[in-house]
Regions:
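Catalytic beta-strand/loop module used to bind and position nucleotide/cofactor moieties
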Residues: 1-2, 7, 110, 118-119, ...
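Residues that cap or initiate secondary-structure elements
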Residues: 13, 70, 103, 113, ...
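Active-site loop/lid in soluble adenylation, ligation, and acyl-transfer enzymes
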Residues: 41-120, 124, 132, 235-238, ...
Length: 310
Protein backbone atom coordinates (compact mmCIF):
# COMPACT_ATOMS: atom_id res chain seq x y z
CA UNK A 1 0.00 0.00 0.00
CA UNK A 2 2.85 2.40 0.77
CA UNK A 3 4.23 2.03 -2.75
CA UNK A 4 0.82 2.76 -4.27
CA UNK A 5 0.31 5.78 -1.99
CA UNK A 6 3.70 7.19 -2.95
CA UNK A 7 2.96 6.65 -6.64
CA UNK A 8 -0.43 8.35 -6.29
CA UNK A 9 1.21 11.52 -5.02
CA UNK A 10 4.01 11.67 -7.57
CA UNK A 11 3.25 14.20 -10.27
CA UNK A 12 0.47 15.90 -8.30
CA UNK A 13 0.43 19.68 -8.83
CA UNK A 14 2.24 21.58 -6.07
CA UNK A 15 -0.89 23.71 -5.72
CA UNK A 16 -3.03 20.68 -4.79
CA UNK A 17 -5.03 21.14 -1.61
CA UNK A 18 -4.80 18.69 1.27
CA UNK A 19 -8.28 17.48 0.31
CA UNK A 20 -7.19 16.80 -3.28
CA UNK A 21 -4.08 14.96 -2.11
CA UNK A 22 -6.18 12.90 0.31
CA UNK A 23 -8.45 11.90 -2.57
CA UNK A 24 -5.41 10.61 -4.49
CA UNK A 25 -4.36 8.54 -1.48
CA UNK A 26 -7.89 7.19 -1.03
CA UNK A 27 -8.04 6.16 -4.68
CA UNK A 28 -4.75 4.27 -4.36
CA UNK A 29 -6.00 2.07 -1.54
CA UNK A 30 -7.29 -1.40 -2.31
CA UNK A 31 -10.11 -3.17 -0.55
CA UNK A 32 -8.72 -4.61 2.65
CA UNK A 33 -5.90 -2.06 2.98
CA UNK A 34 -5.67 -0.64 6.49
CA UNK A 35 -3.79 2.52 7.41
CA UNK A 36 -2.45 2.28 10.95
CA UNK A 37 -2.40 5.56 12.90
CA UNK A 38 -2.90 7.77 9.87
CA UNK A 39 -5.67 8.83 7.49
CA UNK A 40 -5.62 9.97 3.86
CA UNK A 41 -6.46 13.46 5.14
CA UNK A 42 -3.45 13.41 7.48
CA UNK A 43 -1.20 12.38 4.59
CA UNK A 44 -2.51 15.28 2.53
CA UNK A 45 -1.87 17.75 5.33
CA UNK A 46 1.63 16.35 5.90
CA UNK A 47 2.49 16.74 2.22
CA UNK A 48 1.22 20.32 2.22
CA UNK A 49 3.34 21.06 5.27
CA UNK A 50 6.40 19.51 3.60
CA UNK A 51 5.85 21.79 0.62
CA UNK A 52 5.69 24.81 2.90
CA UNK A 53 2.05 25.41 1.96
CA UNK A 54 0.73 24.41 5.36
CA UNK A 55 2.24 25.51 8.64
CA UNK A 56 2.90 23.97 12.02
CA UNK A 57 2.88 25.83 15.33
CA UNK A 58 6.67 25.80 15.33
CA UNK A 59 6.74 27.70 12.03
CA UNK A 60 5.06 30.77 13.57
CA UNK A 61 6.80 33.51 15.52
CA UNK A 62 4.13 34.36 18.10
CA UNK A 63 3.52 37.18 20.52
CA UNK A 64 1.43 36.84 23.66
CA UNK A 65 -0.46 39.89 24.91
CA UNK A 66 -2.53 40.63 28.01
CA UNK A 67 -4.98 43.52 27.77
CA UNK A 68 -5.02 46.43 27.90
CA UNK A 69 -8.21 47.37 29.78
CA UNK A 70 -10.35 49.11 27.16
CA UNK A 71 -13.91 50.25 26.48
CA UNK A 72 -16.07 47.22 25.66
CA UNK A 73 -16.34 47.70 21.91
CA UNK A 74 -12.60 48.22 21.36
CA UNK A 75 -11.84 44.52 21.85
CA UNK A 76 -14.39 43.65 19.18
CA UNK A 77 -12.91 46.15 16.74
CA UNK A 78 -9.38 44.88 17.36
CA UNK A 79 -10.47 41.41 16.27
CA UNK A 80 -10.62 43.00 12.82
CA UNK A 81 -8.00 45.77 12.85
CA UNK A 82 -5.20 43.68 14.37
CA UNK A 83 -5.80 40.89 11.85
CA UNK A 84 -5.23 43.47 9.13
CA UNK A 85 -1.95 44.45 10.79
CA UNK A 86 -0.77 40.85 10.96
CA UNK A 87 -1.72 40.24 7.32
CA UNK A 88 0.20 43.39 6.30
CA UNK A 89 3.30 42.30 8.22
CA UNK A 90 3.05 45.12 10.78
CA UNK A 91 2.54 42.71 13.68
CA UNK A 92 3.36 39.10 14.48
CA UNK A 93 0.62 36.49 14.90
CA UNK A 94 -0.49 36.53 18.53
CA UNK A 95 -2.67 35.32 21.37
CA UNK A 96 -4.29 38.18 23.28
CA UNK A 97 -6.18 37.96 26.57
CA UNK A 98 -8.98 40.53 26.72
CA UNK A 99 -9.69 43.02 29.50
CA UNK A 100 -12.59 45.49 29.51
CA UNK A 101 -13.90 48.25 31.75
CA UNK A 102 -17.67 48.03 31.40
CA UNK A 103 -20.58 45.61 30.91
CA UNK A 104 -21.23 44.42 27.40
CA UNK A 105 -23.05 41.86 25.32
CA UNK A 106 -21.24 40.70 22.20
CA UNK A 107 -23.52 39.02 19.67
CA UNK A 108 -22.33 36.83 16.82
CA UNK A 109 -22.03 38.13 13.29
CA UNK A 110 -25.04 36.13 12.13
CA UNK A 111 -27.36 36.71 15.08
CA UNK A 112 -30.43 38.94 15.19
CA UNK A 113 -30.27 41.77 17.75
CA UNK A 114 -34.02 41.57 18.31
CA UNK A 115 -33.95 37.81 18.84
CA UNK A 116 -31.03 37.89 21.28
CA UNK A 117 -31.34 41.12 23.28
CA UNK A 118 -33.87 42.35 25.84
CA UNK A 119 -33.61 46.09 25.34
CA UNK A 120 -35.05 46.88 28.77
CA UNK A 121 -32.24 44.99 30.49
CA UNK A 122 -29.60 46.64 28.32
CA UNK A 123 -30.87 50.09 29.26
CA UNK A 124 -31.36 49.21 32.93
CA UNK A 125 -27.76 48.10 33.40
CA UNK A 126 -26.07 50.48 30.96
CA UNK A 127 -24.77 47.69 28.77
CA UNK A 128 -22.94 48.17 25.48
CA UNK A 129 -24.10 45.81 22.74
CA UNK A 130 -21.54 44.96 20.06
CA UNK A 131 -21.64 42.70 17.02
CA UNK A 132 -18.40 40.85 16.37
CA UNK A 133 -17.00 39.63 13.06
CA UNK A 134 -17.14 35.95 14.02
CA UNK A 135 -20.16 33.69 14.30
CA UNK A 136 -21.34 31.90 17.41
CA UNK A 137 -23.65 32.93 20.21
CA UNK A 138 -24.16 35.95 22.46
CA UNK A 139 -21.64 36.62 25.23
CA UNK A 140 -22.68 38.45 28.43
CA UNK A 141 -19.51 40.08 29.71
CA UNK A 142 -18.96 42.21 32.79
CA UNK A 143 -15.46 43.18 33.98
CA UNK A 144 -13.92 40.10 35.56
CA UNK A 145 -16.75 37.65 34.85
CA UNK A 146 -15.23 35.89 31.83
CA UNK A 147 -11.94 34.79 30.36
CA UNK A 148 -11.68 35.69 26.69
CA UNK A 149 -8.79 35.48 24.27
CA UNK A 150 -8.22 36.02 20.56
CA UNK A 151 -5.76 33.98 18.52
CA UNK A 152 -4.70 35.57 15.21
CA UNK A 153 -2.89 33.16 12.90
CA UNK A 154 -2.27 32.30 9.24
CA UNK A 155 -5.08 30.10 7.95
CA UNK A 156 -2.34 27.80 6.62
CA UNK A 157 -2.03 26.50 10.19
CA UNK A 158 -5.35 24.70 9.71
CA UNK A 159 -4.89 23.94 6.01
CA UNK A 160 -6.95 20.93 5.00
CA UNK A 161 -8.88 20.75 8.26
CA UNK A 162 -12.63 20.99 8.58
CA UNK A 163 -14.03 23.50 11.06
CA UNK A 164 -14.78 20.59 13.39
CA UNK A 165 -11.11 19.58 13.28
CA UNK A 166 -9.73 23.12 13.48
CA UNK A 167 -11.48 24.16 16.70
CA UNK A 168 -9.93 21.55 19.02
CA UNK A 169 -6.61 21.76 17.17
CA UNK A 170 -6.29 25.48 17.87
CA UNK A 171 -7.34 25.06 21.50
CA UNK A 172 -5.22 22.04 22.40
CA UNK A 173 -2.94 24.32 24.42
CA UNK A 174 -5.98 25.52 26.38
CA UNK A 175 -6.94 21.96 27.24
CA UNK A 176 -3.45 21.51 28.64
CA UNK A 177 -3.82 24.62 30.82
CA UNK A 178 -7.23 23.53 32.07
CA UNK A 179 -5.82 20.11 32.94
CA UNK A 180 -3.05 21.78 34.97
CA UNK A 181 -5.73 23.79 36.76
CA UNK A 182 -7.62 20.62 37.64
CA UNK A 183 -10.37 20.83 35.01
CA UNK A 184 -10.83 17.76 32.80
CA UNK A 185 -12.13 19.55 29.71
CA UNK A 186 -13.08 18.32 26.26
CA UNK A 187 -14.40 19.75 23.01
CA UNK A 188 -18.08 19.17 22.24
CA UNK A 189 -18.60 19.60 18.48
CA UNK A 190 -18.75 21.98 16.92
CA UNK A 191 -17.29 24.67 19.12
CA UNK A 192 -18.10 24.20 22.82
CA UNK A 193 -15.63 23.48 25.62
CA UNK A 194 -17.09 21.43 28.46
CA UNK A 195 -16.10 19.53 31.59
CA UNK A 196 -17.93 16.83 33.52
CA UNK A 197 -19.82 19.63 35.28
CA UNK A 198 -21.11 21.11 32.02
CA UNK A 199 -20.26 23.79 29.48
CA UNK A 200 -17.34 26.09 30.26
CA UNK A 201 -17.20 28.20 27.12
CA UNK A 202 -17.36 28.40 23.36
CA UNK A 203 -15.24 29.34 20.38
CA UNK A 204 -15.81 31.22 17.12
CA UNK A 205 -13.76 31.97 14.02
CA UNK A 206 -13.51 34.32 11.08
CA UNK A 207 -11.26 33.69 8.07
CA UNK A 208 -10.23 36.42 5.64
CA UNK A 209 -9.13 36.26 2.00
CA UNK A 210 -5.80 37.72 3.14
CA UNK A 211 -4.83 34.27 4.42
CA UNK A 212 -5.27 35.12 8.10
CA UNK A 213 -7.95 34.35 10.65
CA UNK A 214 -9.10 35.11 14.18
CA UNK A 215 -10.10 32.33 16.54
CA UNK A 216 -11.46 33.38 19.89
CA UNK A 217 -12.82 31.71 22.99
CA UNK A 218 -14.88 32.98 25.91
CA UNK A 219 -15.08 30.96 29.13
CA UNK A 220 -17.40 31.79 32.01
CA UNK A 221 -15.51 32.62 35.22
CA UNK A 222 -18.29 33.97 37.48
CA UNK A 223 -21.39 35.32 35.74
CA UNK A 224 -24.43 36.91 37.38
CA UNK A 225 -27.06 34.63 35.85
CA UNK A 226 -29.99 36.71 37.10
CA UNK A 227 -28.70 39.81 35.34
CA UNK A 228 -27.80 37.81 32.24
CA UNK A 229 -31.34 36.50 32.05
CA UNK A 230 -32.67 40.06 32.12
CA UNK A 231 -30.45 41.01 29.19
CA UNK A 232 -30.40 37.96 26.90
CA UNK A 233 -33.61 36.46 25.52
CA UNK A 234 -32.12 32.99 25.29
CA UNK A 235 -31.43 33.17 29.02
CA UNK A 236 -35.12 33.78 29.71
CA UNK A 237 -36.09 30.85 27.53
CA UNK A 238 -33.76 28.51 29.42
CA UNK A 239 -35.10 29.70 32.77
CA UNK A 240 -38.68 29.15 31.61
CA UNK A 241 -37.72 25.63 30.53
CA UNK A 242 -36.58 24.96 34.09
CA UNK A 243 -39.81 26.41 35.45
CA UNK A 244 -38.11 28.71 37.96
CA UNK A 245 -36.36 32.03 38.00
CA UNK A 246 -34.29 31.49 41.13
CA UNK A 247 -32.79 28.10 40.33
CA UNK A 248 -29.45 29.50 39.12
CA UNK A 249 -27.97 32.71 40.51
CA UNK A 250 -24.44 32.38 39.18
CA UNK A 251 -22.71 30.61 36.30
CA UNK A 252 -19.17 30.12 37.61
CA UNK A 253 -17.48 27.01 36.16
CA UNK A 254 -13.94 28.43 36.05
CA UNK A 255 -14.12 29.87 39.57
CA UNK A 256 -15.85 26.94 41.24
CA UNK A 257 -13.87 24.21 39.48
CA UNK A 258 -10.43 25.76 40.05
CA UNK A 259 -10.94 27.70 43.29
CA UNK A 260 -8.55 30.29 41.85
CA UNK A 261 -8.81 34.05 41.34
CA UNK A 262 -9.36 35.05 37.73
CA UNK A 263 -5.95 36.75 37.64
CA UNK A 264 -4.17 33.48 38.42
CA UNK A 265 -6.04 31.66 35.67
CA UNK A 266 -5.17 34.39 33.17
CA UNK A 267 -1.53 34.18 34.19
CA UNK A 268 -1.59 30.41 33.68
CA UNK A 269 -2.97 30.89 30.16
CA UNK A 270 -0.36 33.58 29.42
CA UNK A 271 2.59 31.59 30.75
CA UNK A 272 1.62 28.29 29.12
CA UNK A 273 1.17 29.81 25.65
CA UNK A 274 4.42 31.75 26.00
CA UNK A 275 6.41 28.68 27.00
CA UNK A 276 4.76 26.17 24.66
CA UNK A 277 5.19 28.29 21.52
CA UNK A 278 8.28 30.28 22.57
CA UNK A 279 6.24 33.47 22.19
CA UNK A 280 7.59 36.92 22.92
CA UNK A 281 5.62 39.38 25.03
CA UNK A 282 3.76 41.91 22.89
CA UNK A 283 1.80 45.08 23.59
CA UNK A 284 -1.11 47.04 22.20
CA UNK A 285 0.10 50.49 21.18
CA UNK A 286 -1.66 53.83 21.25
CA UNK A 287 -1.78 53.65 17.46
CA UNK A 288 -3.52 50.27 17.68
CA UNK A 289 -6.12 51.82 19.99
CA UNK A 290 -6.57 54.86 17.75
CA UNK A 291 -7.23 52.64 14.73
CA UNK A 292 -9.67 50.51 16.75
CA UNK A 293 -11.57 53.59 17.97
CA UNK A 294 -11.81 54.85 14.43
CA UNK A 295 -13.14 51.46 13.29
CA UNK A 296 -15.76 51.65 16.03
CA UNK A 297 -16.88 55.03 14.71
CA UNK A 298 -17.03 53.89 11.09
CA UNK A 299 -18.39 50.37 11.62
CA UNK A 300 -18.80 48.66 14.98
CA UNK A 301 -20.71 51.40 16.81
CA UNK A 302 -22.97 52.21 13.88
CA UNK A 303 -26.60 51.05 14.17
CA UNK A 304 -26.55 49.56 10.67
CA UNK A 305 -23.85 47.13 11.87
CA UNK A 306 -25.11 46.40 15.38
CA UNK A 307 -28.74 45.99 14.27
CA UNK A 308 -28.13 44.53 10.84
CA UNK A 309 -30.31 41.67 9.67
CA UNK A 310 -27.98 38.71 8.98
Amino acid sequence: ALTRITASLEGAPASSSAKELAARVEAALHEGDTLMGVTPEAVGIAVRRALGAALSWDDIDFEVIHGPVVDPMINVAMDETLVEDVAAGRRKPFMRLWEWNGPQVVIGSFQSYQNEIQQGGVERYGITVSRRVTGGGAMFMEPGNCITYSLVIPTALVEGMSFEQAYPYLDQWVMEVLDKLGIKARYVPLNDIASEAGKIGGAAQKRWASGYMVHHVTMAYDIDAIKMNEVLRIGMEKIRDKGTRSAVKRVDPMRSQTGLPREEILQAFFDHFKEKYNASVGTITEEDLRVARERCETKFARPEWVHRIP
